[in-house]
């Protein structure tokens, strides 16, 4: 029955193309596929956060199994879409997805579960503003979101750089599998790299305003 989870994501994507949903999301023919993918990704992130928080509250094996299948199926599904569409700009996400699958495998096998799941939960929480800002920019590219982008950068860097930095020593000492250990350090440095990218974007947004005013 586990295979049923894998058809969940195509169903979610299909629902996003229904006229009433597209009207609500203010989707146009030019941005429909990207907005649809963003919504599917947001559904995964929110669902994953809820399931993982429930696990920490209950320590239920059923919940952690569902959480594993929920996230594992999403990364396989999205990786498949990236592969068949051959969109080079999305290839880095393939590496990210493979890294996530490595971590999820250890979580599912109860290897350093609490540490890995906690860091995985933080990573999903750090992504939440990204979906909102991406959606707004897709439906209104000219909207000034420099302050929202600043808050996004602060939010993301707090979880993915500051909080993650507090667990570098724990990851180095306590994670059993070397591949998982390397994967976690990759995720940490990827977060730092994305933070730098966000900082550059925020700096450019505020600089552009300053130039126009002068």
Show which residues each predicted segment covers.
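Membrane-helix and juxtamembrane interface regions of eukaryotic multi-pass membrane proteins
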Residues: 1-122, 127-130, 134-214
